[in-house]
Amino acid sequence: MFRVGSWLYGKKPAANASTQSLDSLVELRDLEDAMRAATLILNDDVDGAEAGLAEGTSAFHNLGRGVVAFIRATLGFEQDIMRQASERLNEAETSASVDQHRAQHNSYAPNTYHSPMYLPGTEFALCQAIAQLMSAIVGVLNESLTESIKAFYRLRKAYITLDAILKMEQKYMEESRAATLVESTTSGSVPSSLRHSSSNLHSSSSSISSAKGKEAAADTLAAPSNDTDVQERLADLSLSGEPAVAEDPGQTPTPINTDILDHDPDSDIFQNQIDVFVHSGSNFCFGVLLLLISMVPPSFSKLLSIIGFHGDKERGLKMLWQASKFHNLIGGIAAFAILGYYNGFVRYCDIMPDSIPGKDGDVQGYPQKRLELLLAKMRERFPKSQLWLLEESRMSGANKNLDRALELLCGEERSPLKQVEALRVFERSLNAMYLHKYELCADSFLECVDLNSWSRSLYYYIAGSCHLSLYRDVKETDSAKAAKHAELAEKYFRMAPTVAGKKRFMARQLPFDVFVARKFAKWEARAKEWKVSLVDAVGVDPIEEMIFFWNGHSRMTDEQLQESLQKLAWSESSANTTWSREGPEEKAILKLLRAAVHRSLRKHTQAKEMLEDILGQDRTLFKGHLKDDWICPVAHFEMAANLWMERPTYIATHGGAKQDSNKESARPASVNDALQYEREKVRKCKEYLEKAAKWESYELDARIGLKVTAAMEAVQKWESTHPTL
């Protein structure tokens, strides 16, 4: 058998390897060679990865080529790379299907590997599931609605395969526990010969499982049951047939097998690299699947009916953490997914479940120490990769150290992967924006235009907004500089709508493309009506608006937040000669942005007062041609976020609110009072969230919907742990 370390470094097989058949050794060698080569992309060595994978033609090599293209596609969202990824993944799926049928057909042959845990051909079924899952993600990112719909059917097929593999693991663990129980109950009261026989029961579990698996394949065809057999599920995944359908659209996934998730890579049950591949791969894929589905915003909820199952964020995260333990390609990709989720999504959302201390911390909070250890491990494994440096920068920003985050991305070293370089520059652009470093921000976003074609209208828009801020800063003190910045601002503002709508997501225009085009049209109409220049027709600081939409406030220190308030104050200053002409819409935007900053400053009373003023107005004031119809639903979410942060449990973890008055300053006197106080806060929070979730279609609803979905899940989790008597 092989230890886990042989996965990447090709250690010599153990002495007993000679007893294995040639075919099983060839399969193992193909797996190790393919995964070793594909792993090079996580160290920014795409040429080495492609060259290594080109040396083989096995299903594992085909999958490796697909994975390499998938990583590049999801990093850059470029159509040509996504097409290449789709083609490679389809080839990998077909190749794995052929090998799966071959393995099942030859399952009785002595020259095949017989896993103690998995049925014959499971490794190739997993290859299909990985290809289907990655192909589905690429399909969703595709501009074609047809491809996007097909993607959801691929998710169904991948789900059924992965669920079947998990059932095999569950069955194996149950048999192992039963064998151990028999051994422990008989060892003290039976003859030594029988004790010896009992002790062999556990060690012979491989043959027992193998035999049962073979019997199940025949039994299922003869007598199908409501709980479709694992073998039948795997057989149903033939590419020539119709998409597999779950028995019940609302079925409950296989319960998570906590026992096997407690096993580290050096456990005795992971002695063969094929089993390691299946276990780590199935946990990674199923974990990603459950996590992604749990994050779907309300506006896309109808698509879930195509899939027929629901996400489970907590379970998905546990499975991803398990996959990240393994020193292979899967472990590296799982680590990247984990870090991206916590430093990206969690820090983007404002209402998340409370942290619960435990053995490994709480997967749904922000396990900072655990994340730091994981990142350090990846930096050690892949020292040449800018990808992990990027993750370190994101982690610094997520923990309110934006200066360090920006510094890490301003080095001289560049990644040979264009997609990683584009991500680095984009993150640098955002950090510069949060820090109000306008010239660096503008230059960086203009650099993004050349590196990535995903949302060029947004890049031009933010570059123009930066020069607008610089124009406003010097308008009254340096007319020459002001004129220069005004010219550049207008130039980039006018370029933005010309490239909007070039990209599609599930056949829909990108949310920010729609936003940018409308904003420009609104300003142009105002400039004509007011007879002023375009830059003087712009309302509330668009950079502060962008900081809000990217949730930059959660990454900023109090000092940086105060700077945002100063920038917002310009609108009502004497320098703004058009403020008296503004209607309730622009004034509501100013109040909303100020409320968001005050919430981040933990001044909830002031924040709620501003929001109440917005919500007290007629909602029709914010609807109509060229208007910002997102104001009211976002104000509802902001109110919910304030209420969530006022709870005693939240305060115990993050500190108390900083109120400027004694209003609402009294704290509950007893534990019972505290629970009632918190329950009331959660109840009100939920009311605002439900209104936001049920709001009619509005601009940026998909983006805001991500936060609303996460928030509703957090509230439901709180309610499940605090049931009413």
From Swiss-Prot:
Phosphoprotein found in the keyword field: yes
Keywords assigned: Cytoplasm, Nucleus, Phosphoprotein
Keyword flag Cytoplasm: yes
Highest taxon of the lineage: Eukaryota
Pfam families: Iml2-TPR_39
Alphabetized InterPro entries for the sequence: Iml2/TPR_39
Coiled coil ranges: none
Cell compartments where the protein resides: Cytoplasm; Nucleus
Region span, Disordered: 187-209
GO cellular component, one term: nucleus
Function: Inclusion body (IB) resident protein that interacts strongly with lipid droplet (LD) proteins. Involved in LD-mediated IB clearing after protein folding stress, probably by enabling access to the IBs of an LD-stored soluble sterol derivative that acts as a chaperone in inclusion clearing.
Oligomeric form and interacting partners: Interacts with lipid droplet proteins.
Homology family: Belongs to the IML2 family.
Protein name listed in UniProt: Inclusion body clearance protein iml2
Species this chain originates from: Aspergillus fumigatus (strain CBS 144.89 / FGSC A1163 / CEA10) (Neosartorya fumigata)
Gene: iml2
